[in-house]
From Swiss-Prot:
UniProtKB keywords: Disulfide bond, Secreted, Signal, Toxin
Modifications after synthesis and translation: Contains 4 disulfide bonds.
Annotated source species: Lycosa singoriensis (Wolf spider)
Stated family: Belongs to the neurotoxin 19 (CSTX) family. 07 (U7-Lctx) subfamily.
Distribution of this protein across tissues and organs: Expressed by the venom gland.
Position of the signal peptide: 1-22
Pfam families registered for this protein in UniProt: Toxin_35
Protein name: U7-lycotoxin-Ls1a
Subcellular localization(s) per the UniProt record: Secreted
Length: 78
């Protein structure tokens, strides 16, 4: 009986450690991912750049994306 309990606990611990390790490996956000709530989550050589959105002069919030560091987008002149 003790062997079954010990084996079950060891298996649970192993599965938990594997799950935590898998989460840590894929922790960074790739290029083009939304980073509005996680500004520091972009992968290396990427930065989280934010833009305020407006519709008909009314602010509709802020949107952020992971883009290459130093890259800037600008509004096209109409």
């Amino acid at each position: 009986m003790k062997l079954i309990i010990f084996t079950g606990l060891a298996l649970l611990l192993t599965v938990s450690l594997i799950d935590v390790e898998a989460q840590n490996e894929g922790a960074c956000l790739p290029r083009g991912s939304v980073c509005t709530t996680n500004h520091a989550g972009c992968c290396s050589k990427l930065s989280c750049d934010c833009y305020r959105r407006f519709e008909k002069g009314v602010e509709k919030g802020q949107k952020c994306w992971c883009i290459p560091t130093g890259l800037r987008y600008s509004k096209e002149k109409e």
